[in-house]
């Protein structure tokens, strides 16, 4: 073989090798240290690290939604309200390591110095958009503001935030999976109940809804997503007409006038509701209390609405209101399935130990 031919073969081999290296690197071009341009919920264009390794999440719901993406190991500090041994939110129970992490300041935004001390690559902020921009300006750390919407009228907003989290952490498939799963459950609930005629639906009410603290029987959320999902006859919507899910407190006289046949109450506030009934004897005449049709739900909110609990509550409500349409559903099993999907671990039983749910409660004794 001539030297020229040997040289040609070597040259060709080098070209093939270089091309292969280029193709391989091209298929995995998003390496650690890469950045991606995103637009957050406040409309801010931000360059953020792709799949950051050190993350702080502050504000209502921020940490919860990151846990839906199995990002616990990336969290390097938590707000003070996320620490302690008396926490029973679904994501806290499924990720006990969180309470052992260093504090980054109070709830609703944390403290700048404590956040910076944890050297995060990225901050997820869900409190105030102005505070998010200010935090980025003062720290030089990318801060992404998200809002997370809710499961009813602002569901698409929550889905878009999931998609953004998926983009940042290279978990687009997980975001799509969560969106599809959520929509499938809501569709299933609606399909089971859409043909039930109004005169066959009992009058229902839900009370004891927490909002920036615990509240008694007159605290409601309207529209109440679980009721809407199962097309329930919610007496509160006879008088309260809100476009978005809104927490409000009604007058005692209003509840007495509505006189619901069935009442669902937030299990985290049963003690307050019992106090209400003891303090105001007129409540004892309500049809729901007289017939024993008062049932407990998983806590609706704890530092923002609890996605899995809301969906699980809807199935339990459906089972109580329309047993034939939900004959194949065992509510506790469904709740465990839902929490395991969102958090990787079924936590109903652990929540239930603290806040007994999916059961009748006697408010008269």
Where do the protein language model's features map onto the residues?
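Proline-aspartate-enriched helix->loop->beta-strand connector
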Residues: 104-107, 112-125, 251-268
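Alpha-helical, coiled-coil/dimerization segments enriched in small aliphatic residues
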Residues: 219-246
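Extracytoplasmic substrate-binding proteins
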Residues: 35, 45, 134-213, 296-364
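Bacterial N-terminal signal peptides
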Residues: 13-25
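Sec-dependent signal peptide cleavage junction
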Residues: 24-33
């Amino acid at each position: 073989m001539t030297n020229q031919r040997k040289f040609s073969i070597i040259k060709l081999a080098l070209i093939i090798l270089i091309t292969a290296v280029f193709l391989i690197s091209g298929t995995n071009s998003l390496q650690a240290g890469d950045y991606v341009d995103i637009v957050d919920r406040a409309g801010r264009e931000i360059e953020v690290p792709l799949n950051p390794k050190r993350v702080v999440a502050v504000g209502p719901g921020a940490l919860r939604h990151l846990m839906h993406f199995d990002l616990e190991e990336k969290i390097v500090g938590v707000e003070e309200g996320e620490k302690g041994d008396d926490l029973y939110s679904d994501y806290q129970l499924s990720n006990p390591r969180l309470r052992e992490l260093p504090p980054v300041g109070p709830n609703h935004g944390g403290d700048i110095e404590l956040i910076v001390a944890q050297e995060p690559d990225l901050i997820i902020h869900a409190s105030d958009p102005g505070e998010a921009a200010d935090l980025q300006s003062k720290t030089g750390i990318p801060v992404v503001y998200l809002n997370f919407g809710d499961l009813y009228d602002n569901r698409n907003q929550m889905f878009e935030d999931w998609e953004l989290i998926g983009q940042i952490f290279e978990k687009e498939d997980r975001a799509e999976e969560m969106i599809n799963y959520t929509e499938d459950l809501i569709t299933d609930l609606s399909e089971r109940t859409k043909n039930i005629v109004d005169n066959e639906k009992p009058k229902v009410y839900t009370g004891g809804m927490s909002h920036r603290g615990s509240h008694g029987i007159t605290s409601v959320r309207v529209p109440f997503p679980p009721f809407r999902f199962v097309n329930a006859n919610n007496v509160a919507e006879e008088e309260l007409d809100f476009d978005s899910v809104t927490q409000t407190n009604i007058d005692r006289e209003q509840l007495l006038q509505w006189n619901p046949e069935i009442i669902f109450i937030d299990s985290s506030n049963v003690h307050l509701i019992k106090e209400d009934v003891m303090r105001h004897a007129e409540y004892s005449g309500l049809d729901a209390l007289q017939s024993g049709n008062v049932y407990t739900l998983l806590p609706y909110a704890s530092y923002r609405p609890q996605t899995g609990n809301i969906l699980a509550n809807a199935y339990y409500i459906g089972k109580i209101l329309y047993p034939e349409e939900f004959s194949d559903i065992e509510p506790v099993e469904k709740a465990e399935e839902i929490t395991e999907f969102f958090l990787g671990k079924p936590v109903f039983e652990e929540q239930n130990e603290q806040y007994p749910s999916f059961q009748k409660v006697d408010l008269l004794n």
